[in-house]
């Protein structure tokens, strides 16, 4: 019985270590080690992009988009396994941190940049 309990406890410990833990006070600039989590589930947040000269490159991948209203200031926070994105103006998304869900209210505004679009900039 003790062996089964310890085995289950070990499995739970492995799952917890791969999740974000602890409290995160409201911030527009989460730490580098948290960017993968926050930018995976809402990629339109401004802290997920490096924007220069009208183009934005996603910090976690090779996606390049035209700079527009798609890139939006976000405030993120975490408290008791609740993760929250706040886009201002009453637009927010709350999810269980260990069961995240993609959310992107600005998806329609995303305009990927391609080489043949370069004359449009």
Swiss-Prot record:
Entry annotated with the keyword Signal: yes
Protein induction: Expressed in the early phase of the viral replicative cycle.
Signal sequence coordinates: 1-20
Keywords from the UniProt entry: Early protein, Glycoprotein, Signal
Top-rank taxon, per record: Viruses
Membrane spanning residue stretches: none
Cited InterPro entries: ASFV_fam_110
Residues carrying sugar: 62, 116
Signal keyword on record: yes
Similarity-based family: Belongs to the asfivirus MGF 110 family.
Name of the protein in its database record: Protein MGF 110-5L
């Amino acid at each position: 019985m003790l062996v089964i309990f310890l085995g289950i406890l070990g499995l739970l410990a492995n799952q917890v270590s791969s999740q974000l833990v602890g409290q995160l006070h409201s911030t527009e600039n989460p730490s580098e080690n948290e960017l993968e989590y926050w930018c995976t589930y809402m990629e339109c947040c401004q802290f997920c992009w490096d924007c220069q000269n009208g183009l934005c490159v996603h910090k976690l991948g090779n996606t390049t988009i035209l700079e527009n209203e798609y890139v939006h200031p976000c405030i993120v926070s975490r408290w008791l396994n609740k993760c929250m994105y706040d886009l201002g103006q009453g637009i927010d998304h709350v999810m269980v941190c260990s069961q995240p869900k993609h959310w992107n209210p600005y998806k329609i505004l995303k305009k990927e940049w391609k080489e043949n679009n370069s004359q449009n900039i």
